[in-house]
Regions:
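Intrinsically disordered, low-complexity segments enriched in small residues
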Residues: 2-166
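Thiamine diphosphate
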Residues: 174-176
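Short gly/pro/ser/thr-enriched loop/turn and capping motifs at secondary-structure boundaries
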Residues: 168-170
Length: 176
């Protein structure tokens, strides 16, 4: 309806008071790879309980992250968080953070990181490997290329599909 009328009703997250942190997540684990950040975003979404009154979803205030997150790390964190109903998040030390009513406090340590990796580990043979949801960045394409450079994969290795935009593909091809 909004596309047809050109109007958007002011509701939900369009109200400033609705965009306040309601969950505190203290990160004590060492996160380096984009996959680690994806695991973090996925993890706090899975911690939600019926007792939490978060009609618009968990909106965590995350502390303990490095101040120099890469584009790939930020993308991995936010994409995974969105998959589990988190419409937005705040990172301590990054921008202005409004005061919010914190309903729960969680700690994400090495044990939580390892346990979530184990839960998500394939339990059967992998038939296809996909990268790029959301679309792979140039940095992610470079990382895949670096991992595969000089490797000879077995004939029965599953196919690898990398999804990206035409612009990122062009940059990756041009820059090697």
């Amino acid at each position: 309806a909004c596309a047809l009328t050109g109007y958007t009703p002011k509701y939900g997250l369009l109200h400033e008071e609705a965009r306040r942190p309601n969950l505190r997540v203290q990160v004590t684990a060492t996160l380096t790879e984009p996959a680690d950040f994806s695991i973090l975003g996925d993890w706090f979404g899975t911690q939600r309980t019926a007792a939490w009154k978060m009609p618009l979803g968990p909106m965590p205030l995350i502390s303990g992250l490095p101040s120099d997150l890469t584009h790939e790390q930020r993308k991995a964190l936010t994409a995974a968080a969105a998959n589990y109903g988190c419409p937005l998040l705040y990172i301590e030390g990054q921008g202005e953070i409004p005061e919010g009513e914190i309903q729960a406090e969680l700690t994400f340590g090495e044990a939580e990181l390892a346990a979530r990796y184990e839960e998500l580990r394939p339990k059967t043979a992998v038939s296809l490997i996909t990268i790029g949801c959301p679309q792979a960045s140039v940095g992610e394409i470079r990382a895949v290329a670096q991992l595969l450079r000089g490797q000879t994969l077995p004939a029965d290795a599953p196919p690898l599909w990398v999804f990206t935009s035409s612009a990122n593909k062009a940059v990756a091809e041009k820059t090697g």
